[in-house]
UniProtKB/Swiss-Prot annotation:
Pfam family, one: HEAT_SCC3-SA
PTM section of the record: Phosphorylated by PLK1. The large dissociation of cohesin from chromosome arms during prophase is partly due to its phosphorylation.
Keyword Lipid metabolism: no
Bias type Basic residues, positions: 1083-1095
Gene (UniProt): stag1
GTP-binding among keywords: no
Known partners and oligomeric status: Interacts directly with RAD21 in cohesin complex. Cohesin complexes are composed of a heterodimer between and SMC3, which are attached via their hinge domain, and RAD21 which link them at their heads, and one STAG protein (STAG1 OR STAG2). In cohesin complexes, STAG1 is mutually exclusive with STAG2.
Name the UniProt record assigns to this protein: Cohesin subunit SA-1
Sequence ranges of Basic and acidic residues compositional bias: 62-73
Length: 1265
């Protein structure tokens, strides 16, 4: 038998141990006799329903059973009827047996039952300890505790034995081993009740003890006890429900036997059998009553309290099991008294609990026989279930839709039209499982054939090959009424799994489009035909590609062999059908641009080999003929691009039909080229006197050629010459031919790109490259001219082409071993850069009022605004791309950056990314650009309001706010950005003192107010750099300036204070010392030099650490070209000469301030050397005072061990919105929960050690930039 550890149960003394062993043996003998006696009485009283009397036998003894009588056989535990040994020879407990799961569960339970028969107290003690250990408790219930203590006292004692260091317990531990343990745990309880259902559960001891214990544990405040006991109780209840169901079945069978026997005639009636049947029915009823009492105890004592437990897992267990009870024993449990708990829990705040509710209800609604019992529940909670189709948890929404589908399947009257409409629109959901579930609902509601045979007969009478005609029309009507015509692909994808037969019925769709309606059929409108064509093309795409449309799913998944075969079969089927049908469809709808554009998408999904293998070349000729007619009829871009793409697909080299298609294509281009050439000559001859027909002929021919030139190499026709002539004429006669100029620009652009492709792929001669260079140069000049003349449409087109060509023909062209193409590299001159920037300022950063006025009265006002914004964003992005790749000077970005706040909603993401990339290129130049943008805003404000600015005005506050946002972009690592920030302060100081006040030296310089803006960056300076910048500031100050205290001098006072104060508040302790709390705590304990030594380090190195690390901290080089892109950086032309000649200049433009990274890196050093060489006693005494203050503050920090909390993100301003302004590539640092000031003081000097800096940089989880 399985016992608990008797060594734990026994007393510590030898005498008491002997006595306890004797008493245990006696107790075991007595309890065995008592149990056997009770079982005999129970059998005589109730019998064993469902089993013949001969089945009442004791379990057969095993060899291990005999070992129980041997002395010393009691150990830590027993399993399978004999002591189990682990690897070290120690027996294992019941918990360990179940956890290992190596033994058959029924054998484990049978052994426990036998031990119960021998000593029920010991066996129950094993079971109690099993539940305790399954809860993760290390304690053990002793036999004296079990006999002498109440359950509440035992649970309180076990609570004290919990391991408080870990919150995990078996049911919550991760991994497959513990997942299997949960299954074994549930199986053990189920098998235990099943094996005890004929005897032990009726002894009024075992079940009472277990239920009482589980009830107490389920009410514990310890989550592990509550969770484990609730799971055990619910599984126990489920097993009892199964027993009750069996008893009910036996009762019914016994009653039928009794009625049959009683209805016999008296001569054949067996009175003894009647008496036995009556006795059996009575015993069954008594057993049923006992089981019901047990179930009521569990339900009222545990379920009613735990279904609303604070822990979602516990609530989910309760709901899951009550669903099992209602399905298993619907006569007893499927009523409103139990359903209400599921209905109430539909409103649970946790998705997993709501999901269990829906799963439970699905199992009930699947059985249509149960619908009458669910009618009241459906009426009461239907609205809630329908609303859950919009649940924020997608898994819940999917199951809610499936439940609604089951309700519809069981009773169509249960759902109103409004309920159905709430589900219909979900077929357009971006989440595919939701959409597919809604598609299944839609299929059952609208597209299921109620009487297939009758519909097939009707179709034959009407001469149709498919009975799906009405369903296809219904699908079209649904699509049109949903008013989401751009989402046909989503609708098809949603219905694909449930309505494939309908969606693949391309013969039916073609019949509806081509053939005339039969008598009694309703004629399809033009709008319905367009919708049907769109849906048909979407079904073809879905069948050929076998993956969801863009926006649904995470990407293309690998198809299974079966799916791949289905895909190939579908592709063959659609190709065979549409090779014949497509020319007919194009012929009928050749005048309808929308239908033709959709129909021409079909050939890309063909298996083109079938043209030759199936000998269908005549159908190919028909298709090419129809495409040519379409090209001649239409000038819409969508139609022409579809024709061009179709030719490109059919011309593929891997198919034998290539030559036939290329001949047709060349003939078409020859004809279009001749028309274009003649039309251009006529137009240029007439010039300003050209009529509309001549202009239209040129525009139509050019538009067709442009669309074809996009996908085909047409350079042998040399369209660039005529296009260039049109462009020159358009510039001379401004406004005459706007559309022609736009198309000519685009066609010329394509021609240049195709010429470049030829040169890069071959071995070009110098003459070929010179010719292309000449072509590009002339085209760039024309585009530049278009920027200053012509209409807005032409300007925008010219600007985009200029940006693209400057990017393509930049230094990136020579990378990858293509140095021979250096002749083709173009660098924009200052004039072109200026014009591009002016265009951005005039056409991108425009006032909203102007835009609103220009669109006032438009019916599609909102759509036009969105389209206009999208166009402006593209213009800005194109120009910013030139800045990022160093094609346009970085200073041009100042005009972009200054609009960051004003246009944050429209362009904030683009400007932020540009700033991030420019900082990666050159930190120092980026900082100079930022301060330049602020200077520009300041100058604009001075020009508007004069030099006497109102410091409290909204305009000044706006500039300060922009400066604060810029400061946040430097991130938290002040070591990496120190030179850039110092350079920014230098430029700002020079700007503030650039112009002296003409009224005299007693008046502030004209730009002095700018220092208030500059003070926003002071928090980004290191402590020693603040002193350096302060010293540089003092160079510009006179004694008179330092004494002034009037309001006009407040910006200077404020800026000086920001440099002088706050030295002990900088964030060195959180910059580079570790990016997380764990790393910080390690650094604070390991490798830390003695405190007195660290003081010396700080005093000696705090003033010259910037000198010793000049070779360690370097400005990043040019921006590395990102992978998977065709753009490459050209070398920075502004390289640093080894020696800079001396030159005379004003103080604000000294040689050491030239734009040179190396010289900029040395600026702090030069300033510090000047400070060290100064012999001004006042300054030296001031520094001594500062040093003394630091010593005093450090002494206070060492003596004060009070924990502090610091939020590094809030240290500059303390405003929560600052968090959102950090760039995505800015390091986020997590501080430890607390650190006393002593630790922070001890940590600081590490950051002035070059070795520590290297260590810290390598320790970051991600780079700063």
């Amino acid at each position: 038998m399985i016992t608990s550890e008797l060594s734990v149960l026994q007393d510590s003394t030898n005498e008491s141990a002997v006595m306890h062993t004797d008493m245990t043996a006696v107790s075991a003998d007595l309890s065995t006799e008592l149990v056997e006696d009770l079982e005999v009485k129970g059998k005589r009283k109730r019998g064993r329903p469902g089993r013949p009397p001969s089945a009442i036998k004791k379990p057969r003894k095993t060899p291990g059973d005999r070992s129980r009588a041997e002395p010393g056989s009691r150990g830590r535990g027993r399993a399978n009827g004999h002591p189990q040994q682990n690897g070290e020879g120690d027996p294992v407990t019941l918990f360990e047996v179940v956890k290992m799961g190596k033994s058959a569960m029924q054998a484990v339970v049978d052994d426990w039952i036998e031990s119960y028969k021998q000593d029920r107290d010991i066996a129950l003690l094993d079971l109690i300890n099993f539940f305790i250990q399954c809860s993760g408790c290390k304690g053990t219930v002793r036999i004296e505790m079990f006999r002498n203590m109440q359950n509440a006292e035992i649970i309180r004692k076990m609570t004290e034995e919990f391991d408080e260091d870990s919150g995990d317990y078996p049911l919550t531990m991760p991994g497959p081993h513990w997942k299997k343990f949960r299954c074994n745990f549930c199986e053990f309880i189920s098998v235990l009740i099943r094996q005890c259902q004929y005897s032990i559960i009726y002894d009024e001891y075992m079940m009472d003890t277990v239920i009482s214990l589980l009830t107490g544990l389920s009410d514990s405040q310890v989550r592990a006890f509550r969770h484990t006991s609730t799971l055990a109780a619910m599984k126990l209840m489920t097993a009892l429900v199964n027993v009750a169901l069996n008893l009910s079945i036996h009762q019914d069978n016994t009653q039928r036997q009794y009625e049959t026997e009683r209805n016999k005639i008296i001569n054949k009636r067996a009175n003894e059998r009647l008496e036995l049947l009556l006795q059996k029915r009575k015993e069954l009823q008594e057993n049923q009553d006992e089981i019901e009492n047990m179930m009521n105890s569990i339900f009222k004592g545990i379920f009613v309290h735990r279904y609303r437990d604070a822990i979602a897992e516990i609530r989910a267990i309760c709901i899951e099991e009550i669903g099992v009870w209602m399905k298993m024993y619907s006569d007893a449990f499927l009523n409103d008294s139990y359903l209400k708990y599921v209905g109430w829990t539909l409103h649970d705040r946790q998705g997993e609990v709501r999901l269990k509710c829906l799963k439970a209800l699905q199992s009930l609604y699947t059985n249509r026989e149960l619908f009458p019992k669910l009618e009241l529940f459906t009426n009461r909670f239907k609205d809630r279930i329908v609303s859950m189709t919009l649940d924020k948890e997608y898994d819940v929404a999917v199951e809610a839709i499936r439940l609604v589908t089951l309700i519809l399947h069981g009773s169509e009257e249960a759902l109103s039209n409004e309920d159905c409409e709430n589900v219909y629109h979900l077929v357009y959901s971006a989440h595919r499982p939701v959409a597919v579930a809604a598609g299944e609902f839609l299929h059952k509601k609208l597209f299921s054939r109620h009487d297939p045979q009758a519909e097939e007969a009707l179709a034959k009478r009407r001469g149709r090959s498919s009975p799906n005609g009405n369903l296809v029309k219904m699908l079209v009507l649904f699509f049109l009424e949903s008013e989401l015509h751009e989402h046909a692909a989503y609708l098809v994808d949603s219905l694909w799994e449930s309505s494939q037969e309908l969606l693949k019925d391309w013969e039916c769709m073609t019949e509806l489009l081509v053939e005339e309606p039969m008598q009694g059929e309703e004629v399809m409108s033009e709008r319905q035909e367009s919708a049907l064509v769109e849906l048909m093309v979407c079904t073809i795409r879905q069948a050929a590609e076998a993956h969801p449309p863009v926006g649904r799913g995470t990407g293309k998944r690998v198809l299974t062999a079966k799916e791949r075969k289905t895909q190939l079969d579908d592709k063959t089927k659609l190709t065979e059908h549409f090779i014949v049908a497509l020319p007919v469809l194009l012929s009928k709808y050749s005048a309808d641009a929308e239908k033709v554009a959709n129909l021409l998408q079909i050939p890309q999904y063909f298996d083109l080999e079938l043209y030759s293998t199936g000998r269908m070349e005549k159908h190919l000729d028909s298709l090419l003929k129809q495409i040519r007619f379409v090209v001649e009829k239409h000038i819409e871009s969508d139609v022409l691009e579809a024709c061009s793409k179709t030719y490109s697909i059919l011309c593929s080299e891997e198919y034998t039909i290539q030559n036939r298609v290329e001949i047709a294509h060349s003939q078409l281009i020859d004809e279009l080229a001749d028309r274009f050439s003649h039309a251009v000559e006529e137009l240029l001859q007439e010039a300003e006197e050209a009529d509309e027909d001549e202009i239209y002929n040129v525009m139509a021919s050019l538009k067709r050629l442009t669309c074809f030139h996009n996908a085909h190499d047409l350079t042998k026709w040399d369209f660039f010459g005529n296009c260039y002539r049109l462009l020159r004429a358009g510039i001379e006669h401004e406004g005459m031919m706007e559309q022609i100029v736009v198309q000519a620009l685009q066609c010329s652009h394509y021609s240049i790109l195709w010429q470049l492709v030829k040169i890069t792929e071959g071995n070009p001669s110098k003459e070929e490259m010179l010719a292309l260079r000449k072509t590009v140069k002339s085209f760039l000049a024309v585009c530049q001219q278009c920027l200053s003349s012509m209409t807005t449409l032409v300007k925008e087109q010219a600007f985009m082409l200029l940006c693209d060509l400057l990017m393509i023909f930049s230094h990136q062209l020579t990378t990858g071993g293509r140095e021979n193409l250096l002749l083709l590299v173009f660098n924009p001159d200052v004039g072109l850069q200026s014009e591009l920037l002016s265009f951005v300022m005039d056409h991108v950063f425009i006032d909203q009022d102007d835009e609103n006025q220009s669109m006032e009265g438009d019916e599609e006002d909102e759509a036009n605004k969105i389209e206009a914004l999208h166009k402006r964003r593209n213009l800005l992005a194109s120009f910013c791309k030139l800045i990022i790749y160093d094609i346009v000077d970085m200073n041009a970005a100042a005009d972009i950056f200054k609009h960051y706040m004003k246009y944050y909603n429209d362009y904030g993401d683009i400007i932020k990314e540009t700033l991030s990339k420019t900082r990666q290129m050159d930190k120092i130049q980026c900082a100079k650009t930022l301060i330049l943008s602020l200077q520009q805003l300041f100058n604009e404000l001075v020009q508007e309001q004069g030099p006497n600015l109102d410091r409290t005005s909204a305009h000044v506050s706006g500039i300060k706010e922009l400066a604060r946002r810029f400061a946040l972009t430097f991130g938290l690592d002040q070591i990496k950005t120190r030179e850039a920030v110092a350079t920014l302060h230098k430029d700002g100081i020079e700007f503030a003192f650039k112009y002296q006040n003409p009224k005299g030296p007693e008046y502030p310089p004209l730009n002095l107010a700018f220092l208030e803006v500059l003070s926003e960056f002071s928090s980004k300076l290191l402590r020693q750099d603040k002193k350096t910048v302060h010293s540089y500031l003092e160079k510009f100050l006179t004694d008179l300036m330092m004494e002034r205290r009037e309001d006009v001098w407040l910006p200077l006072i404020s800026y000086r204070n920001s440099l002088v104060t706050g030295g002990d508040e900088d964030r060195l302790s959180v910059n580079s010392g570790g990016s997380n709390s764990k790393g910080s705590s390690v650094r604070s304990k390991k490798g830390r030099p003695p405190l007195h030594k660290k003081r010396v380090i700080e005093e000696e190195s705090i003033d010259n650490s910037w000198v010793t690390r000049n070779d360690t901290i370097q400005t990043p080089g040019a921006l590395t070209t990102p992978q998977l892109t065709s753009t490459v950086l050209r070398e920075n032309p502004r390289q640093i000469p080894e020696q800079i000649p001396e030159q005379e200049s004003e103080p604000s433009s000294e040689p050491d301030f030239l734009h040179s990274p190396q010289m900029q890196m040395s600026w702090l050093g030069q300033q510090k050397l000047e400070d060290l060489n100064r012999k001004d006693r006042t300054s030296m005494s001031y520094m001594k005072v500062r040093s003394g203050v630091r010593h005093a503050v450090r002494g206070l920090m060492e003596d004060d061990a009070e924990p502090i909390f610091e939020d590094v993100m809030m240290s500059s301003r303390g405003q929560l919105e600052d968090m959102n302004e950090e760039f995505e590539d800015t390091m986020v640092i997590d501080l430890p929960p607390s650190r006393n000031r002593r630790e922070r003081a001890e940590l600081r000097p590490d950051f002035f050690d070059s070795a520590a800096i290297i260590e810290d940089d390598s320790g970051f989880g991600m780079p700063m930039f």
